[in-house]
Amino acid sequence: MHDKDVVFTAGPGGRMQGDIRVPGDKSISHRSVMLGSLAEGVTEVSGFLQAEDCLATMAAFRAMGVEIEGPTEGRLRIHGVGLHGLKPPAAPLDLGNSGTSMRLLSGLLAGQAFDTTLTGDASLVRRPMRRVTEPLRAMGARIDTTEAGTAPLRIAGGSRLKGIDYAMPVASAQVKSCLLLAGLYAEGKTCVTEPAPTRDHTERMLAGFGYPVARDGNRVCIQSGGKLSATRIDVPADISSAAFFMIGAAISPGSDVFLRHVGINPTRTGVIEILREMGADIEILAPREVGGEPVADLRIRYRELRGIRIPEHTVPLAIDEFPALFIAAACATGETVLTGAEELRVKESDRIQAMADGLTTLGIDARPTPDGMVIRGGSFRGGAVDSRGDHRIAMSFSIAALRAPIPIEIHDCANVATSFPNFVELARTLGLDIEVS
């Protein structure tokens, strides 16, 4: 956890112009280390996100005996140890602020011969883990949590896992991925059915490492007994990081931004769909496929936005982008209504309440609901808001300053380093006036 209050002071006003590539995708970076470590041979990764969350995953595998060279300018060489080559770590694995690391590792480690303990910072140990521990226990895993169902997770080694056919109550890529990774070690077949599509990076990457995955509509199955073969991975730019600049350009008159090599996996493009529905001018240029993942360049120019009722099918496809989308809604004409997004209340912070409080402080009519928010577009005033240590909230309010008449001061921004360490530098490149103190 970061002790010092890092403050961003952003704006006021301005526009965004320029041509940049944002850092590598966080989801794909995590998974490249996990599967590369379990593969046979040396996996080479380029475009790896050198942010605290992904470095926490890397440190965990190093602690379990995996040799990883780098990262140097986003390049890694991972000397895989095979599915059964991990060694017991000498101490609990501290995963910092990273929910992805904890939930995916819980599945992967449930099938090992040794005991492990997973812990993290003050935010991570408050996040709900029953969603992974309950189905893992149904597979035969032995995992202890706190009474509240939160970390530390104590995972007993030597459990004989059995395949499961699990229907997820809530759409969650982390739960799906956790169970598929456990399925690598479970007797027989493991199948997961999701109520709505979620990001499918794990399935794509397993296939990229030569491991067969069967997909049929909203159901995915994996059979144990295979092996992962080392490969090369080129991590595309993270659409969740690109979203801040997409929205910055969409809300500030005179803006014209070009974002290169962005991952446009269809399970992640809800932000583009929602912005286009609001009237945003977004071009998808030179679409191509890189290592099994769709990639394109994006051009975003300012155009006036209108409020909409956000289609519920887009919620899992844009779950990490809603803090920034709330800023777009605040700049739109009319009312924007989000429903079906109760998942936002159990992210790094309660993102519904934190964003509603911040928007209200800045003069916007934002009414939180149990599963979403109603935002009436208006004019920002300046002021001070609290990001609650949540990286995405800190970056979202920074972008809001493009439409504010006086600066916006955002407190508790140190965790921006968990996902987007050079956010301030790139934001300045595009024309945002932002200071860090």
UniProtKB/Swiss-Prot annotation:
It holds the Pfam family EPSP_synthase. It comes from the Bacteria. It is found in: Cytoplasm. Keywords: Amino-acid biosynthesis, Aromatic amino acid biosynthesis, Cytoplasm, Transferase. The keyword Cytoplasm applies. Phosphoenolpyruvate binds at residues 26, 99, 127, 174, 351, 392. Its EC number is 2.5.1.19. GO terms for cellular component: cytoplasm. It catalyses: 3-phosphoshikimate + phosphoenolpyruvate = 5-O-(1-carboxyvinyl)-3-phosphoshikimate + phosphate. InterPro entries: Enolpyruvate_Tfrase_dom, Enolpyruvate_Tfrase_sf, EPSP_synthase, EPSP_synthase_CS, RNA3'P_cycl/enolpyr_Trfase_a/b. NCBIfam families: aroA (TIGR01356). Belongs to the EPSP synthase family. HAMAP family: EPSP_synth. Monomer. This is 3-phosphoshikimate 1-carboxyvinyltransferase. It comes from Methylococcus capsulatus (strain ATCC 33009 / NCIMB 11132 / Bath).
